[in-house]
């Protein structure tokens, strides 16, 4: 992991097309601004983790009887 120190109004550039700028620092909270192509997905970590968790729950809740019926229909 690369760790950088930046002050307000300073920034970093990733791959020449993603710009991240420190907008403000206030009582333990940092506001960041992002400039990136529209095709670049930018998510907060907690949102990404929630999506992964929901996807895992959805895939784990497969009805076993449904799978057995599918196996009966599709025979090798």
Swiss-Prot record:
GO biological process: bacterial-type flagellum organization; mRNA catabolic process; negative regulation of translational initiation; regulation of bacterial-type flagellum assembly; regulation of carbohydrate metabolic process
Domain of life: Bacteria
Function: A translational regulator that binds mRNA to regulate translation initiation and/or mRNA stability. Usually binds in the 5'-UTR at or near the Shine-Dalgarno sequence preventing ribosome-binding, thus repressing translation. Its main target seems to be the major flagellin gene, while its function is anatagonized by FliW.
Subunit annotation: Homodimer; the beta-strands of each monomer intercalate to form a hydrophobic core, while the alpha-helices form wings that extend away from the core.
InterPro entries (UniProt xref): CsrA, CsrA_sf
HAMAP family: CsrA
A GO term from the CC aspect: cytosol
Organism of provenance: Helicobacter pylori (strain J99 / ATCC 700824)
NCBIfam families: csrA, PRK00568.1
Family per record: Belongs to the CsrA/RsmA family.
Keywords: Bacterial flagellum biogenesis, Cytoplasm, Repressor, RNA-binding, Translation regulation
Record's keyword annotation contains Lyase: no
GO molecular function: mRNA 5'-UTR binding
Gene: csrA
Keyword Repressor: yes
Subcellular location: Cytoplasm
Record-given protein name: Translational regulator CsrA
